[in-house]
A protein has these predicted regions:
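Short, compositionally stereotyped local motifs that mark structural "simplifiers"
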Residues: 25-38, 48, 515, 519-631
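Bacterial Sec-dependent N-terminal signal peptides
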Residues: 1-24
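Active-site neighborhood of glycoside hydrolase catalytic domains
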Residues: 305-411, 416-427
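Flexible, acidic glycine-rich loops studded with aromatic residues
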Residues: 395-411, 417-562
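Flexible loop/turn segments at secondary-structure boundaries
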Residues: 55-56, 172-174, 200-206, 271-277, ...
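Contiguous, structured surface segment used for ligand recognition
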Residues: 20-159, 496, 511-538
Length: 631
């Protein structure tokens, strides 16, 4: 945690201040002072490193990947008195994170100081953001003055766990695509990659002692269209979609992430979400006669509302089957040997217990172990898994359902069903990662559903930006940090994944790094727009949904449909039409709620800034808008 030094910085820099001329840094640093003047990078840049910097060669490689490849600047290692870019190791104040850094730029050059290699690395990420967006280009940029503003920046993270979860089970992402994901994370000072490696739709990691897990569980029939509406697979159809990571792939990803100061958290999701495992070992459910297949995207789970759900197929491991624990011991032995991180995530979420209630084996287990209900049955399972994981020298983490029926000793809780579970777990002195779906589920809609790819729920950028990883009521001593989750049921491609992730991942990055008092929505929006330019250069996809209007619909005078609109981003003008023609800035501007005129069947709206279109043209049929009226 960042302590006293930060509060002094608030007094120096002001809270939530932002000048248009200041560099657009995300996440916003604790303290940043700018002065007149800039340092232009020379054609030959001399660099020096303090003795003891362990990853000097990697830092040189990183500098070369942009400065030499993109800017054409040659690099030369020299003594510090000849260097225009110096990397120095310092002693960290007791109140500061070892990930802290200081960055100074003046007429003599650039100085990056930090108590650790991680801090030096984060200083470099800030350095890149001080350069023009063209530094992110994929090819050489000529005739550019690569200048950096004179500044003094002091920075440190708010929390230690700054995570993103990537679901590689529902849709598979290749090793190289995961590396790109890691690069994008690192650029915004994330330091935990949570890999959701297993689910009903795929088993994505090699377990050498259990080859059937990937031979059977990693592949399914290929489908195109809307997830949840696919037809059921024929057992005989070719299983052409899927893939998995070999253990050598995992080692390569771990090394790649570690160079960028990112730890990888593996998740093996049990006892529910286990259909891919059961396709390989069907006798491990409480309904062993089921003809299991890896799920291909057809709907078998149902959520009727009120937080309740049920399944058409038993996709759970059976807590009463001793062979389950033997198999899990084998799996976690190999997982623990692969991943250096202290935690292993065992899932524990969305276990439909109706199948257990019908099982004679479960009834015998309850009688033998004096278990009162199905929550205690799940707790029995979780505690046994916790002991298996502990026997491998690791700590267990799970989604907040692992609290049901009694929390296992020492277990970490990832709080996704709001903040309540995480707050309660922290008061019980259990480590907590805050990941509430109401702020951090970046697979939800981020704009009007009529303009977005199909998904569910709603999480607009501004709401994401309100995320506080240490919510009121939590014991901050036990809150490790926070993370965003990118579930991939509906994400068929990397471009779609990027669209859902950015810019909401900017918002979470700032929420987990920057002091709460430094966050400012209007400033954040301005900075995002600069980072959109950086992403354009890098070829990274992103969503511009924040520019689109937010609509609410109601009935007035019994039958007339009234539409109210507002913007998420300030200083936009909304223009609209009912005449089947796209509205330009000469069409009526929205000022107050509008009523569909008689005979009109479609509303068209678009946002403008300074007379130029900035949002998407939204085509809103009356029939669709009527569906939003609450009766």
């Amino acid at each position: 945690m960042v302590k006293a030094w930060l509060f002094g910085c608030f007094l120096l820099t002001g809270i939530g201040s932002f000048a248009q001329t200041e560099p657009a840094l995300i996440p916003v640093p604790v303290e940043a002072r700018y002065s007149a003047g800039s340092f232009s990078l020379p054609a030959m840049l001399n660099i020096s490193f303090d003795a003891g910097i362990a990853d000097k060669s990697f830092l040189l490689q990183q500098m070369g990947s942009k400065l030499t490849r993109i800017a054409g600047i040659e690099l030369k290692e020299t003594p510090s008195d000849q260097a225009q870019l110096q990397f120095k190791l310092t002693k960290a104040a007791a109140s500061l994170s070892p990930e802290s850094y200081q960055l100074s730029i003046n007429e003599k050059g650039i100085l990056i100081e930090a108590p650790s290699s991680a801090g030096l690395f984060y200083g470099v990420q800030t350095l890149w953001q001080l350069l023009p967006p063209a530094i992110e280009s994929k090819s050489r940029v000529a005739n550019m003055n690569w200048s950096l503003p004179y500044c003094s920046i002091k920075d440190a993270p708010r929390v230690g766990w700054r995570g993103l979860m990537l679901d590689v089970a529902r849709h598979f992402f290749t090793k190289e695509q995961v590396k790109d994901f890691i690069d994008h994370m690192a650029a915004y000072k994330y330091n935990r990659l949570h890999l959701h490696l297993t689910d009903d739709q795929g088993w994505r990691i090699e377990i050498k002692a259990l080859p059937k897990l990937t031979e059977v569980g990693a592949f399914r029939g290929e489908r195109t269209g809307r997830w949840g509406e696919f037809g059921k697979q024929d057992p005989k159809e070719p299983k052409t979609y899927g893939g998995y990571y070999t253990q050598e792939d995992i080692k390569e990803l771990l090394a790649y992430a570690a160079e960028r100061h990112i730890s990888i958290l593996p998740e093996i999701d049990i006892p529910g979400h286990s259909m891919a495992l059961l396709a390989a070992y069907p006798d491990l459910s409480c309904t062993p006669g089921t003809a299991y297949q890896v799920n291909g995207g057809d709907r078998f789970m149902h959520w009727p509302g009120g937080g309740k759900f049920y399944s058409d197929i038993d996709n759970n491991l059976c807590p009463a089957n001793e062979r389950v624990y033997a198999l899990l011991d084998t799996i976690f032995t190999e997982i623990a040997a692969l991943f250096p991180m202290e935690y292993i995530h065992m899932g524990g979420d969305e276990t439909y217990k109706g199948w257990w209630e019908k099982s004679a084996a479960i009834k015998d287990l309850m009688k033998r172990e004096k278990l009162k209900d199905m929550h205690e049955v799940q707790s029995y399972f979780v505690k046994r898994v916790g002991k298996i994981i502990a026997s491998k020298g690791k700590k267990m983490m799970g989604w907040d359902e692992i609290m049901e029926g009694g929390l296992a000793s020492g277990a970490g809780v990832m709080s996704w069903q709001g903040e309540k579970g995480g707050i309660a777990a922290s008061k019980m002195k259990h480590p907590v990662v805050m990941s509430p779906n109401s702020y951090t589920y970046v697979d939800l809609y981020q704009g009007d559903p009529l303009a977005e790819p199909p998904t569910y729920g709603m999480l607009r950028l501004k709401k994401t930006y309100e995320f506080n990883p240490v919510p009121a009521g939590a014991d901050p001593a036990y809150v490790l940090g926070g993370q965003a989750n990118l579930w991939s049921e509906r994400l068929h491609t990397v471009r779609h994944a990027e669209y859902m992730l950015w810019p909401r991942a900017f918002a979470v990055a700032e929420s987990v790094w920057s002091p709460q008092q430094k966050k400012d929505w209007n400033s954040f929006v301005q900075r995002i727009e600069t980072h959109f330019k950086r992403f354009d250069q890098a070829g990274i996809n992103y969503s511009t949904s924040m520019y689109d209007p937010i609509l609410s619909v109601r009935t007035v005078k019994d039958t007339a449909v009234e539409v109210s609109m507002q913007t998420e981003v300030p200083n936009l003008n909304i223009h609209y039409s009912f005449d089947e023609f796209p509205p330009d800035n000469f069409y009526p501007e929205y000022k107050s709620p509008i009523v569909f005129p008689a005979g009109a069947s479609t509303l068209r709206v678009q946002t403008y800034r300074q007379g130029k279109p900035i949002g998407r043209l939204m085509i809103l049929p009356l029939a669709e808008l009527k569906k939003r009226i609450r009766k």
